[in-house]
Amino acid sequence: MDIREMDLKRQEANALFKKQMIDEALEIYKTSFLEATKSVVPGTRNDLLEEQLSLLAYNISVVYYKRKNFPKSLAFGLESLKHRKSDKVLCKICAIYLRLGMLREYKEMYDQMVTRSSGPEVAFLLKRMKLSEVIVEKHLEKRVTLESLHELSKEISGGRSIPADTLESILEQGESILLGCENVVHTESSGEVLIFGDTHGQYFDVVSILNKVFDKDRMVIFNGDYVDRGSHSVENFALLLSLKILFPGRVHLTRGNHELSDINRVYGFYDEVKRKYPFSSDSVYRRFQDAFRALPISIIVNEKVFITHGGLPEAPVKVDNLQEIYRMTDTHTDELLKGLLWSDPEEILGTEESKRRAGVVFGADVTARFLERNGLDLLVRSHQAVDDGYRVHHGGKVVTIFSAPEYEGSKGPGSYLVLNPSAGEADEIVEISPLTRYKAVKFGRSDGKEVLRLLCN
């Protein structure tokens, strides 16, 4: 493919992009970029070819930005800069840094651009970005620290609400980090991994158990449904999001069905926000929804354990398909997303209609097919209040974990799951494969006044 053909292909893709035919445009951009890289001759530089490589990489970056896949957008933005310096690309990378919560990188690049001699277009972009630069300065000053989180915990224990400006800062910082996650987060751990299910606003119970089990050698995963029903939903999600900000590689959060606005507006969370923030409830509630929409859908641990809030969709699916879901939504139009957030396992074959009117009831054969197709050993999900906070389905291939003790007046405990337990009686530990072992641990209610006391680094 010569330079002229590359340019024509790129213009064809641009036309498709303008018509909102995003998938078709991306395919042409990527194919053309790959062909262009084959034309590079080592040890020589062709300025026209470098220009096409830069433009194509930038176009790909823009598509991924539009899809809110900011890590890939950043990768292709930086690739574009390798081939040609461009103020427009620098501005785009600034915007990506901001969305990813990479505030210092944003500030450094913004300062560089201010000192560059730029044309009127870039001057206009910089003027628009000035507000973001002010926000970044504010967040660098109000960045969450372990010390500030401890102090906030003391205030909550004393019966006081989180100040609205502090809460909105936590939500903005957390959203930026969550936006940097793919739909399905792949993570590795050689140590224990603790998985918690629904916590439903039971903030003090969460603080109590974290004080006992959270340390520098353990990864912690919370599997959705942080809000509604309990009386401290605001504090519960703010705490867990703060831990995600502080320990982004060790704390992971997924989205549950109660992180959908049409659910949490009805089941208590919206009323809690109005009660605690009467003068800024709309703004605070909107900030929460922005953060909820940014939550990843699923997590895979050590390429063997698949964690998602609800269960499996009706149609056969591979993990790669899940990465293409548009998750920044509150609608129920995507069948894959509905299945992941709403479905439940039963001892049946195939699938049946769910009484929830969303997702399906799925059987052991559906589980086996999904695990086999994706090279997985175990599905961990939440979504249902079960006896003892823990239930095994489908011959041990599916585990439900529920972490709200004495939920809605019941007497049952909460539980969390320990992957790769380092200790435990032989009859406590379930071995799915040589690489996948787990045990469930029960816990009860706190005294309702717990203060966070994390001593890890």
UniProtKB/Swiss-Prot annotation:
InterPro entries: Calcineurin-like_PHP_ApaH, Metallo-depent_PP-like, PPP_phosphatase, Ser/Thr-sp_prot-phosphatase, TPR-like_helical_dom_sf. SMART domains: PP2Ac. Binds 2 manganese ions per subunit. Keywords: Hydrolase, Manganese, Metal-binding, Protein phosphatase. It catalyses: O-phospho-L-seryl-[protein] + H2O = L-seryl-[protein] + phosphate; O-phospho-L-threonyl-[protein] + H2O = L-threonyl-[protein] + phosphate. It comes from the Eukaryota. The keyword Metal-binding applies. One of its GO terms (molecular function) is metal ion binding. Its EC number is 3.1.3.16. Mn(2+) 1 binds at D198, H200, D225. Mn(2+) 2 binds at D225, N257, H309, H383. Its cofactor is Mn(2+). The active site is at H258 (proton donor). Belongs to the PPP phosphatase family. PP-1 subfamily. This is Probable serine/threonine-protein phosphatase ECU05_0440. It comes from Encephalitozoon cuniculi (strain GB-M1) (Microsporidian parasite).
